Amino acid sequence: MNSYFEKELKEIKASIHSLNEVVFEHWVEEGVQTINTGHKIIVSGLGKNVPICEKFVGSMVSVGMDAAFLHTNSAVHGDMGIVKDGDMVIILTKSGETSESIYLARHLKKRRVNIWLLTFEAESTLTREISNCVILKLEDEGDMWNIMPNNSTTINLIILQGLCMQIAKRRGIQIEEFRRNHPGGHIGEVLSNGSWHE
């Protein structure tokens, strides 16, 4: 069993190493600018990427940075009203060919928003239509058929959490912000009695 996990860890590590650091740095800088100018970062996905998006939003707001989740399906049925001029919208799609994501992207391009794509395919409809692309490589999903959204969603989570942490670091967010927003649970107790350690 350990050999399975070791193999998948290698897959995930290799995928993360395929990240273009210059592109990621640009993404972080634009994320900082988005938040600093009073706008928000919206992340959009569907299927198994939904909880990944929600985790990113939860991390962002827990340190006082405005973020929202926009379901790719319901976006074009009225939910796109959450998108305002100046916002950043991150679209998650492994293939870049998901019809719902393409439809959403084309409508977002009519607005004054900063669109980013997080994907695993360098050549796709969306990589051709969206100029800001974070493109990762992935050889194997880790399931029996190499088709289930398994390793790809894990990698999306790692990348988005990294984006959140880097934006927070660049903005100089202090532990007091997290303490104010997270009074509950064991974390809240640890923060309130000062027993946490950097």
Predicted regions mapped to residue ranges:
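An N-terminal, well-structured beta->alpha segment
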Residues: M1-T37
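Catalytic cores of large soluble enzymes that bind and process phosphate-bearing ligands
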Residues: Y4, L19, V23, K48, ...
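Phenylalanine-focused residue identity feature
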Residues: Y4-F5, F24, F56, F69, ...
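Secondary-structure transition/capping residues
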Residues: V23, I42, Q174-F178
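Amphipathic alpha-helical interaction segments
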Residues: H26-E29, P51, H182
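Glycine-rich phosphate-binding loops that contact phosphosugars or nucleotide phosphates
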Residues: H39-R171
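Internal, active-site/partner-interface "lid" segment
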Residues: R128, G142, A168-E198
